């Protein structure tokens, strides 16, 4: 039985800082299949640290993956420049190994059975518990942390943030293919990831004390051994004083990454301010949140989403434009107006899942060409 806790301290952040984690995949330059060479890449880049001591490259479950991590930043622009610098180092380290880097929610044709696991007590326990489903986690995402000042704001913000789940997923959806087949989904990663027992949508707790009771119960019954084992789509990160948004598929370009990170930053800061002003944040019933998640995973930018507790519906891109207009003043205050404005261009240019399908169609179904395109998109 795991140790239990009576309280979960939340180290509030005095400012709405931002940090980003970017999971990327290693692929062979010739075959374009996944390459289990992360250990060699880590050896080549060495111990990279951000200005605040944060490790900038970290291991993940599979040895075909590198996670690039920023330090704590005041602006999205600074965070993305941090990522760009580390990404350049990772690509230079991978190049002599015959390896390229790309980012998407899934690889178009790789097979899970050939992927090697990273050995660690945490990952060993995860695979022992989850077995076949755990071995299937050939997926990549982007996680955005935003600082929150007080623990009692966390769940009001988190619960309201769930109303924008489909917007964030539709914009970032980049996993239409799995093991050589088009799944028919914009984000197959989303449905794969929720198969893990501690993944999926968060519970909509009313306050921090309810969350502490939940953590106590989960630790006592051995559901997870420490809070890092809680893999919700949005979760509190008490150690850092942040809300961590983990909805997004892997994002293939720096420009899209900056735009979606700015969107998340603005959403959380806007909700924080509304709570300060005495407003009651808008929420959706859990059944609507669950349905919106599925619709965005299935239909992407063509999803019709449920917008309120009265079950009204709207095209996600129409609702998105109203949201962006509402957030413009917040973006100006946070210094990310240009990045937020870029969000509106993603539906015009096509989200990654749409671009991947377009490349596949133009190459008569050649999925190697899809990986080629994703590798080249990393320069954008």
UniProtKB/Swiss-Prot annotation:
Q: What class of enzyme is it?
A: ligase
Annotated InterPro entries: GCL_type2/YbdK_subfam, GCS2, Gln_synth/guanido_kin_cat_dom, YbdK
Per its record, the protein catalyses: L-cysteine + L-glutamate + ATP = gamma-L-glutamyl-L-cysteine + ADP + phosphate + H(+)
Q: What is its EC number?
A: 6.3.2.2
Lineage: superkingdom = Bacteria
Query: Pfam families, alphabetically?
Result: GCS2
Task: Supply one GO molecular-function term.
Answer: ATP binding
Q: Where are the transmembrane segments?
A: none
Instruction: For this UniProt record, give its keywords in alphabetical order, as a comma-separated list.
Output: ATP-binding, Ligase, Nucleotide-binding
Give the record's GO biological process terms: modified amino acid biosynthetic process
Which family does the UniProt entry place this protein in? Belongs to the glutamate--cysteine ligase type 2 family. YbdK subfamily.
Q: What does this protein do?
A: ATP-dependent carboxylate-amine ligase which exhibits weak glutamate--cysteine ligase activity.
Q: What is this protein called?
A: Putative glutamate--cysteine ligase 2-2
Q: Which organism is it from?
A: Nocardia farcinica (strain IFM 10152)
